[in-house]
Every structure is written in structure tokens, then in C-alpha cells.
């Protein structure tokens, strides 16, 4: 039981690149495909109209496409995340979340910087 708890804590503590690498290992070596949309999600009670009207306060900055000028995008990703060169390059090539839980203003600023470098970015 303690070993499983330790394993769960290690998985939760993975960085985005480590999680991407884990996904690739599970897929390539064990044939385990990630479920689209998250297989663990459970439907909760229906949200009332008041909940639907709430404005989102935290955003994920998602890199959709690095574009033609990957070097500038890698530089911006390094500046935003503090990752090393190889990790930033891997993230840019694989795509995915650059930053999680950013405020709206910070997320918009990151999006502008990445788009100025030539990347296609979404806020989720």
C-alpha cells in the first residue's frame, strides 16, 4: 500500500516532459494508448446557470504548432518555463501545455510572446 502511494506521488510530481516521456514508454513498450479526453473523468451533477456564468480564472497555455521558426519559439518557451534547451526543444516539437494554471493576464502575455515568435497557441 505504501509503495502504491509513493508511486502515485511520483506520477503526480512529473513535469510535462516527463509525463510525455512516460506516455511514450507506456505506448511503445506496453501498447497502452492514452484515453482521449481522460478515462478517469466522472460525470458530476449538472451545473446550474450560475456556475456556467462564472468566468474562468486559471488558464493553460497550450502550444498547438511551433510554426516555421522553431528556434524563436524554443527561446520563448525557455523564458516562460525556465526549462533547459533540450527540454524546451522536446516540448516545442511535441506540442502540449507550456504553462498550467496561469492567470488570464499572464496567459495572454505568454500567448502573445509565443505567437510573435511564430507559434500557434491556444488558451484552455
Swiss-Prot record:
Q: What is this protein called?
A: Large ribosomal subunit protein bL12
Keyword field: Ribonucleoprotein, Ribosomal protein
Instruction: Kindly give the CDD domains that the UniProt entry links to this protein.
Output: Ribosomal_L7_L12 (cd00387)
Q: Disulfide bond as a keyword? A: no
Q: Do you know which InterPro entries this protein is assigned to?
A: Ribosomal_bL12, Ribosomal_bL12_C, Ribosomal_bL12_C/ClpS-like, Ribosomal_bL12_oligo, Ribosomal_bL12_oligo_N_sf
Give the family per the record.
Answer: Belongs to the bacterial ribosomal protein bL12 family.
GO molecular function annotations of the record: mRNA binding; structural constituent of ribosome
Instruction: Indicate whether Ribonucleoprotein appears among the record's keywords.
Output: yes
A Pfam family (short name) is Ribosomal_L12_N
UniProt-listed HAMAP family = Ribosomal_bL12 (MF_00368)
Its source organism is Paracoccus denitrificans (strain Pd 1222)
Q: What does this protein do?
A: Forms part of the ribosomal stalk which helps the ribosome interact with GTP-bound translation factors. Is thus essential for accurate translation.
Q: How does it assemble?
A: Homodimer. Part of the ribosomal stalk of the 50S ribosomal subunit. Forms a multimeric L10(L12)X complex, where L10 forms an elongated spine to which 2 to 4 L12 dimers bind in a sequential fashion. Binds GTP-bound translation factors.
Cite a single GO BP annotation: translation
**What is one term from the GO cellular component aspect held by the record?**
cytosolic large ribosomal subunit
